[in-house]
Amino acid sequence: MTQDQLKQAVAQAAVDLILPKLDDKSIVGVGTGSTANCFIDALAQHKGAFDGAVASSEATAARLKGHGIPVYELNTVSDLEFYVDGADESDEHLNLIKGGGAALTREKIVAAVAKTFICIADASKLVPVLGAFPLPVEVIPMARSHVARELVKLGGDPVYREGVLTDNGNIIIDVFNLQITNPVELETQINAIVGVVTNGLFAARPADVLLLGTSEGVKTLKA
């Protein structure tokens, strides 16, 4: 199977997992990126089975609306049963690196609200140790140099992602060459740097379920 076929398979598996638990009042949290887009397309086939969605980015909101799925502001939603999103890396404990698409802050907020965080990914994203994929950090623009110096102290090689502004108007620094043996600790350390909005480690709040697309079919891992 191609990578696109694996993404479509896990997206459909996520729809199959949540659909029996949805009703006409349900609102679904939706992530950002190519795998999340596959989920949106699959979910749209059942748009009469739930109320609407909360989007983690402007791009996701536009895709949902394009399918005729109502999009709600998170502040107006009191109950979010599911959040479904992809990942750039996952370890066996379902700690994740996310943010390749620069939507990490809103993704992390929606994930924090959701009762169940379902991560969907192809098999290449499962790794023994996080960090081969550079860790994105969302930063207030005036703090860029300060944050970069602090990230060097933590052992990383920070690189400014040129030409990218987040939906929140901030910049992204990608941190290379981190061996992330304690994701929760590193997530806390980086978030404590003045000027950091948040970083792409989802470890304090990891995924609850990982649906992994493999050549043998979709495998389910739980934290």
From Swiss-Prot:
UniProt record, GO biological process: D-ribose metabolic process; pentose-phosphate shunt, non-oxidative branch
Gene3D superfamilies associated with the record: 3.30.70.260, 3.40.50.1360
rRNA processing found in the keyword field: no
Substrates-to-products reaction catalysed: aldehydo-D-ribose 5-phosphate = D-ribulose 5-phosphate
Domain of life: Bacteria
Enzyme Commission designation: 5.3.1.6
Secretion signal, residue range per the UniProt entry: none
GO molecular function, one term: ribose-5-phosphate isomerase activity
Keywords: Isomerase
Leading EC class: isomerase
Pathway: Carbohydrate degradation; pentose phosphate pathway; D-ribose 5-phosphate from D-ribulose 5-phosphate (non-oxidative stage): step 1/1
Ligand binding (substrate): 32-35, 85-88, 98-101, 125
Catalytic residues (positions): 107
Keyword Electron transport belongs to the record: no
Listed Pfam families: Rib_5-P_isom_A
GO cellular component: cytosol
Family, similarity comment: Belongs to the ribose 5-phosphate isomerase family.
Role description: Catalyzes the reversible conversion of ribose-5-phosphate to ribulose 5-phosphate.
Known partners and oligomeric status: Homodimer.
Xref: HAMAP family: Rib_5P_isom_A
Name this protein carries in UniProt: Ribose-5-phosphate isomerase A
